[in-house]
Amino acid sequence: MKIKIIIFFIFFLILPLNSKAQEGFRFLNKTKNKVRVDFKLINNLMVIPLKINNKELAFILDTGSNKTILFNISDNDTIGLKNIEKVTLQGLGKGNSVEALLSQKNTISLQNIQSENETIYVILRDYFDLSGKMGVTIHGIIGNNLLDDFAVKINYISKKIDFYQSKKNKFKKCKKCSILPIRVIRGKPFIQVKVKLDTVDKVFTDVNLLIDSGGSDALWLFENSKENIKTPINYFNDILGEGLSGTIYGNRSRIPALQLDAFEIPKPTVSFLDSLTTVNAKIFKERNGSLGSEILKRFTVWIDYPNKVLMLKKNSNFS
């Protein structure tokens, strides 16, 4: 049975500071234009090595998060977190909020990339149990604060990520690629795609989806976020994963097609979530769901955050 891992939609009830009011990540060697990082692909999720205050850790790279979250530390981990205070967090699920720690002015480095002024949220209990589910030690999640000053190329076949200084780099157009605009809202990338739904026969519906590399599923749709987004007749209710605020349930089914510009994917699996479950995910009121790694891994993916461009080229996973 496929391991269900959900790392979506962490919503902060308390925001004591503006996390972008800092210098952010940069190349230490400014003469270089590219940094290449190897990653492990486990259950569709990218696991990268990085250092926090010079301590080597393993983090999931999650484009669906705009914060750095640490949730698997033991008494033997000497990370040296700085400027700590208590905060309250709320995530997907219908349970209560949870207590966490907020730590400021930490140094995070990834090879030749570094920031000395990073905010980290520390969840005192490992609600996700990702290490147990994935079979390797996972210390946390790092989101778009690592990505949003760069253009990145993600190769799911070779398992490499290339970071480019966006101002010095323009992705070369290719005949077999599709280029789509993205919207970056509160540090999170959104894309408009088309879905063909059972409820509307052969008509395609435009939907706004979060590009979410931290979600192992193919596609999530929020029921009734548009009039015709409803669970098809044939479905089964399932546990989709665990959020900070409890278990996340939804209806699993298939839809006739997903269209990403020139690329059409027939009969993708879809999870339909109700409005109560997704209330904390709607930072963007026009959002209709998420595009997860089960779809993303079928492409070589270029994301240029500063220029708000996504480019896709199908790879050997595409079918």
What are the language-model segments listed below?
Residues 1-26:
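Bacterial Sec-dependent N-terminal signal peptides
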Residues 19-319:
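Pepsin/retropepsin-fold aspartyl endopeptidases
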